[in-house]
Amino acid sequence: FCYEMAESLSKIAQALGKDAKIHIKLDTGMNRIGFKPTKESVDIIEKIAKLPNIKIQGIFTHFACADEADKTETYEQERKYDQFITWLEERDIYIPIKHVSNSASIIDLDGFRKDMVRSGIITYGLYPSEEVSKDVLDLRPAMELKTHIVYIKEVEAGEGISYNHTYVTDKKTKIATIPVGYADGYPRSLSSKGKVLIRGQYAPIIGRICMDQF
């Protein structure tokens, strides 16, 4: 996504006697990494294409709002991408593999699939958002996380649970502690919202998820 990176790859590839096969990242609206869709970027990519032992195999962008019902921004990103491809080909730079579709656009925008797609969250059986179609793919969660209860205690009504006491018991309650937290990648956003399955019965997550337990 920058000339300096390609130049470094070229030097390494030459030293190893191999070709570095790369894909160019184009930033059409995500505003993270990638070349901006400008004529100046075309100049840089033309220079990259001439570097020794560099083979440009693909060029891609990433949609910022494809999981929203309103696809206006996504269509605009696609327009910028297509325009940039036209500019490259006017310079006789033909890149064989073109890809733009993430999970949401795989579902809702089948005309954007081009040469390949990049399935992300749908690979795990989850929909990107509540706003995408549920009719195209019948998704089911493909992963589960198993652990053990490490401690059980009873607390009286009116007791606050975990950090900041965001959950307060309204009756005498049995509390189980599970040794998983946000340090393990378990989303803290599930605090007082998520559920766990214990011997076939759902139990609510109460209180704030900690670094290593909830």
Model-predicted regions and their roles:
Residues 145-192:
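Functionally critical, mid-to-C-terminal surface segments that flank or help form catalytic/ligand
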